[in-house]
Amino acid sequence: MSADLLSLFTATFVTFFVLIDALGVAPVFATLTAGGDAAYRRRMAVKSIIVATIIIYGFAFGGSWLLGAMHISIDAFRAAGGILLFMIALDMVFEKRTERREHRAEEHLGTHSADPEPDDISVFPLGIPMVAGPGSIATAMFYMSDKSDWIEKGVVLSAIGLNLLLTLVIFLIA
């Protein structure tokens, strides 16, 4: 593996590790699945990662086409994505992102705690937007639109996939 590909993998992995924030989402996952048994927790973890994988990879491959169909240039989307990533970074610095996630989890539990059967939370709120949020979707599109070589695209996709696999492991442990 060349140094350029290793650098690309590392940059992509670190970027998605911060964006997906598996360690920050794990307590929310644990809270949202607290009412279910081990099989329910495992099912929600696997389904949420499958949903997030489909969404992120779908936008990584088809996002540029979708933007073109809506007459939005990739540069305009990059500018909006940069602003979004900056806002996420500010939230992380001031710990507001974690507070919002915890608030959503408490709100969800408060409205659904009387249900005898736990809800299917794998698509919303876990798969989308907690794992496959706007930041990770936009970043996947950016990384894939910059790469013309399929080897580089494979490196980007493998770094994203490793992050999603790591998120699954963290969910299963939580």
Predicted regions and their residues:
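Small-residue-enriched transmembrane helix starts and helix-helix packing motifs
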Residues: 1-19, 95, 103, 107-126
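Membrane-interface helix termini and inter-helical loops of multi-pass transporters
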Residues: 2-3, 64-73, 140-153
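Juxtamembrane transmembrane-helix termini in multi-pass membrane transport proteins
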Residues: 6-60
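Structural signature of hydrophobic alpha-helical transmembrane segments
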Residues: 8-25, 74-83, 154-167
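Generic transmembrane alpha-helix signature in multi-pass membrane proteins
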Residues: 17, 26-33, 124-129, 136-146
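Transmembrane alpha-helical segments of integral membrane proteins
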Residues: 27-32, 164-174
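Juxtamembrane helix-boundary/capping and inter-helix hinge elements in multi-pass membrane proteins
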Residues: 31-43, 72-75, 114-118, 144-151
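Membrane helix-loop-helix hairpins that form the core translocation module of multi-pass transporters
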Residues: 39-102
